UniProtKB/Swiss-Prot annotation:
Protein name: Ribosomal protein uS12 methylthiotransferase RimO
SUPFAM superfamilies: Radical SAM enzymes
Chain residues that bind [4Fe-4S] cluster 1: 13, 49, 83
MTTase N-terminal domain: residues covered: 4-120
Necessary cofactors: [4Fe-4S] cluster
Binding site for [4Fe-4S] cluster 2: 144, 148, 151
Cofactor note: Binds 2 [4Fe-4S] clusters. One cluster is coordinated with 3 cysteines and an exchangeable S-adenosyl-L-methionine.
Keywords recorded for this protein, A-Z: 4Fe-4S, Cytoplasm, Iron, Iron-sulfur, Metal-binding, S-adenosyl-L-methionine, Transferase
Source organism: Chlorobium chlorochromatii (strain CaD3)
Length: 438
C-alpha cells in the first residue's frame, strides 16, 4: 500500500508551531510521510491563526490556494485546523464546502483519524521540528485565564492549563537528544505556570531543572505583568545558561486605558515591576509589545505612552494598531479613530523606539558577546545574541574570514558597529566547552 503523504502549512505563532510539530510526529509514527512540496502530497493540512485580522486573511488566502490545488488534481484532500475553525467553523463550512474537514485547537486525535492514523498518548513528548535544529520552543501551558478585553485567545484556546512539570522535562530531554541547544519557553502566559495545579508558581522550579540539563540558552517569552514570580529574575541573574532576556507585553501605560483593557495592573504597578526586575538583574534586556489606538485613546493618553517608552528604554519593542476582534469584549466599544490615525501613532511610537534601540545597541560596540549562528552565506554569518529571540528580534551580521563555522554553533563575537536592529562585527572564536550553568 502506498505511503500517505502530507503537506502541513503552519501559520501564526510559535504555539501553533509546537502543535504542528506534535501532529507531524504522530503522523510519522503512523507511516504518514511529511513532504515539503505541495505537488508531492496527497493531503494539505493548514494550521491557521486568527489572532489579528491580517492573520485571518492570510489563513483564508492559504485555504483558497489549497482548494485550487485540489481542483487541479494536485492533492486529494484539504484539511484545516487551529484557531480559525475554533472561532468560525460553521461559517467556514458554509463558505468553503470543498474543504474536507475543519478541526479546532484541541482535536489532534480527530485530525489523525481523518488521516487514517491513531493518536498515541505515549508519543505526546515527540515532535518533528519545524525550526532549525539548534533551537526549539517548549510550550509550558495551554489556554489563558486573563480577561483582556481586546483579546479572543481565551475563547480560542480555553482555560489556562499548566503542563505537568515532569512531562515538560521529558519533552525537553527529547529535544536535547535531537540536538536542540536553545530552548524558548512559551505559553499564552508564562507567569501563571503552576498556579492552576499547585496553587503557586512553578516557573522558577522549572527553570532551575531545565538549567541543570545544560542547554546553552534558555529564554522566557510571553510573561504577564501580574503574578510574575520575581525569583525567576534572580535565577536568570545567577544561571549563565538562562538568557538575560524577558518578553513581557505591557500593551499600554495609561491607567484609564489599562482599566478598559481589563489588564489588572496600573502604571505605577508596572513601573515598580520593571524597576525591581532591573534592580535584581542589571543585565536583563526587556522586550515588550504595545497596542495603540484602543477605543477612546486620546492624543494626550498616547503621548503619555510615548513618554513612558522613552523613559523605560525597552531593548526591544513591537507595536500594533488596535482593531476590533469579533469575539473580544472590546468589540462592543465605539472605535472612533481612523485606521490612518492608528497607523500614524504606530509609526510615531516606532520612530521613538528606533532612537532608543540605536542608543542601547551602541553600548555593545567594542565588546565581545556570545552569539549563535542561524545561517551564513559566503563570508557573512547571520547570528543572534542571548538578547534576541528567533524570528522577532535583532540580528548580528558578522564576518568570519577563513574560519570554518557551522549553523547552530555558538561563538564569541567582537562588535564594532551597530544600528537600531543590527549589530555588526566579526566572529572571534568558538564558544569554549564546559561552561557551567551554575
Amino acid at each position: 500500500m502506498p505511503t500517505h503523504s502530507l503537506f502541513l502549512l503552519s501559520l501564526g505563532c510559535s504555539k501553533n508551531t509546537v502543535d504542528s510539530e506534535r501532529l507531524l510526529a504522530q503522523a510519522a509514527a503512523a507511516a504518514i510521510r511529511s513532504v515539503e512540496r505541495v505537488d508531492e502530497a496527497d493531503t494539505i493540512l493548514i494550521n491557521t491563526c486568527a489572532f489579528i485580522e491580517d492573520a485571518k486573511k492570510e489563513s483564508i488566502e492559504e485555504m483558497l490556494a489549497a482548494l485550487d490545488k485540489k481542483r487541479e488534481g494536485v492533492v486529494k484532500q484539504v484539511f484545516v485546523m487551529g484557531c480559525l475553525p475554533e472561532l468560525y467553523r460553521r461559517e467556514l463550512q458554509e463558505e468553503l464546502p470543498e474543504v474536507d474537514a475543519f478541526f479546532g485547537t484541541r482535536e489532534l486525535p480527530q485530525i489523525l483519524a481523518s488521516l487514517g492514523a491513531r493518536y498515541r498518548s505515549e508519543l505526546f513528548d515527540e515532535r518533528l521540528l519545524l525550526t532549525p535544529s539548534h533551537y526549539a520552543y517548549l510550550k509550558i501551558s495551554e489556554g489563558c485565564n486573563r480577561i483582556c478585553s481586546f483579546c479572543s485567545i481565551p475563547k480560542i484556546r480555553g482555560r489556562y492549563q499548566s503542563q505537568p512539570l515532569e512531562q515538560l522535562l521529558r519533552e525537553a530531554t527529547r529535544l536535547q537528544q535531537q540536538g536542540v541547544q536553545e530552548l524558548n519557553l512559551i505559553a499564552q502566559d508564562i507567569s501563571l505556570f503552576g498556579y492552576d495545579t499547585t496553587g503557586h508558581s512553578q516557573l522558577n522550579e522549572l527553570l532551575l531543572r531545565l538549567s541543570d540539563m545544560d542547554f546553552l540558552w534558555i529564554r522566557l517569552l510571553y510573561a504577564y505583568p501580574v503574578n510574575f514570580p520575581l525569583e525567576v529574575i534572580d535565577t536568570m541573574r545567577d544561571r549563565s545558561n538562562i538568557c538575560n532576556y524577558l518578553d513581557i507585553p505591557l500593551q499600554h501605560c495609561n491607567d484609564r486605558i489599562l482599566r478598559a483593557m481589563k489588564r489588572g495592573v496600573t502604571k505605577a504597578d508596572t513601573i515598580r515591576l520593571l524597576h525591581e526586575m532591573r534592580q535584581r538583574n542589571p543585565n536583563i534586556r526587556l522586550r515588550t509589545t504595545m497596542l495603540v489606538g484602543f477605543p477612546g485613546e486620546t492624543r494626550a493618553e498616547f503621548e503619555e505612552l510615548l513618554d513612558f517608552v522613552e523613559e523605560q528604554r525597552f531593548d526591544r519593542l513591537g507595536c500594533f494598531p488596535y482593531n476590533h476582534e469579533e469575539h473580544a469584549p472590546s468589540a462592543m466599544l465605539e472605535d472612533l479613530l481612523s485606521i490612518e490615525e492608528k497607523e500614524e501613532r504606530v509609526s510615531e511610537l516606532m520612530e521613538l523606539q528606533e532612537a532608543v534601540a540605536e542608543s542601547l545597541n551602541r553600548e555593545f560596540e567594542g565588546k565581545e558577546i556570545e552569539v549563535v549562528v542561524d545561517s551564513f552565506v559566503e563570508e557573512m554569518a547571520f547570528c543572534r545574541s542571548e538578547y534576541d529571540a528567533p524570528e522577532v528580534d535583532n540580528e548580528c551580521l558578522l564576518t568570519f574570514g577563513a574560519q570554518n563555522i557551522q549553523a547552530g554553533n555558538f561563538y564569541r563575537a567582537l562588535i564594532n558597529d551597530s544600528s537600531a536592529h543590527e549589530l555588526y562585527g566579526e566572529i572571534v572564536q568558538e564558544r569554549s566547552a564546559g561552561n557551567s550553568p551554575q
